[in-house]
Amino acid sequence: MNRLKAKYQDEIVKVMMEKFNYTSVMQAPKVDKIVINMGVGDAVTNTKALDMAVEELQLLTGQKPLITKAKKSIAGFKLREGMPIGAKVTLRGERMYEFLDKLINVSLPRVRDFRGVSKKSFDGRGNYTLGVKEQLIFPEIDYDRVSKVRGMDIVIVTTANTDEESRELLTALGMPFQK
């Protein structure tokens, strides 16, 4: 069992139940899934760019990404409906906890001038969105094999009803929020 999952089950649930006066263990919020999205704008003209993005996401997560397609045509971007323009991965279960552990303890501290993640990125329903400017913060990505520095969006979906509950959960898991 992953150490983050064990910490959640052994310590965090008890603390959350006391703090928010839950009557059942099932009311305590938990991390439901993590969605990692990498938009590849230059995939319209360069198909190799999308292949590299897919390969990098697969290295990070350990599962095959889903290629996302354009929903509608935009002439200004030379984009047609159905063209592949990005890749995404949805992580659940063990892989989700492994990725979250790696993100919090290894990758985020490697960001240049890192002072913590923003407290304002909650969506009002208990989910947290985090933008990463470069994929090089992850130890699996080899600097020499990267053709272009790309960012990604990481959405942490929780079962929490409010942002306050979600913030408390993520702080307990070790997410480094700004002071």
Swiss-Prot record:
GO terms for molecular function: rRNA binding; structural constituent of ribosome; tRNA binding. It comes from the Bacteria. InterPro entries: Ribosomal_uL5 (IPR002132), Ribosomal_uL5_bac-type (IPR020930), Ribosomal_uL5_C (IPR031309), Ribosomal_uL5_CS (IPR020929), Ribosomal_uL5_dom_sf (IPR022803), Ribosomal_uL5_N (IPR031310). The keyword Ribosomal protein applies. The gene is rplE. Part of the 50S ribosomal subunit; part of the 5S rRNA/L5/L18/L25 subcomplex. Contacts the 5S rRNA and the P site tRNA. Forms a bridge to the 30S subunit in the 70S ribosome. The keyword tRNA-binding applies. HAMAP family: Ribosomal_uL5_B. Keywords: Ribonucleoprotein, Ribosomal protein, RNA-binding, rRNA-binding, tRNA-binding. GO terms for cellular component: ribonucleoprotein complex; ribosome. This is one of the proteins that bind and probably mediate the attachment of the 5S RNA into the large ribosomal subunit, where it forms part of the central protuberance. In the 70S ribosome it contacts protein S13 of the 30S subunit (bridge B1b), connecting the 2 subunits; this bridge is implicated in subunit movement. Contacts the P site tRNA; the 5S rRNA and some of its associated proteins might help stabilize positioning of ribosome-bound tRNAs. It comes from Exiguobacterium sibiricum (strain DSM 17290 / CCUG 55495 / CIP 109462 / JCM 13490 / 255-15). SUPFAM superfamilies: RL5-like (SSF55282). GO terms for biological process: translation. This is Large ribosomal subunit protein uL5. Belongs to the universal ribosomal protein uL5 family.
